[in-house]
Amino acid sequence: MNIGQAPEPDYDSVKIDYVGFVDPYAVEGMVVLKADNGKEFHMRAFSGEVAKHITSFGETEGEPAPSIYRMIEEICEQNELTLVKVKIYDSGDVLRANLYFTGKKDLVLRNQRASDAMALGAYYKIPILVRKKLLKEKLEA
């Protein structure tokens, strides 16, 4: 797939609708990703620290970005690359993601941790795409 190619029909663009924690100690994070059609994907089983970072990226006066995010930003700047989208998919029992960069040349980093990729998507405010089969109708309690 080329970077500028039209979106694949089996992926939907999502927004981060909710960020929280599964446990009272904020060890395990969770997010709810929501598509324009209202379908949701609940993602969990990742570090509570990543959830805290995602929350801080949306704040105007939050904590400074962790050094790893600044390091990736510097690597991109020095190599004239820009992260343009993140695609989340299932691979067996785990979630993985592809990171799409463009610039001097197109680059795709495949099979990365989905939670880290989603955090980068939130940090850079870029499209986050999720495989449609992962999206479900919202359940009312």
Model-derived features with residue positions:
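Divalent-cation
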Residues: 2-141
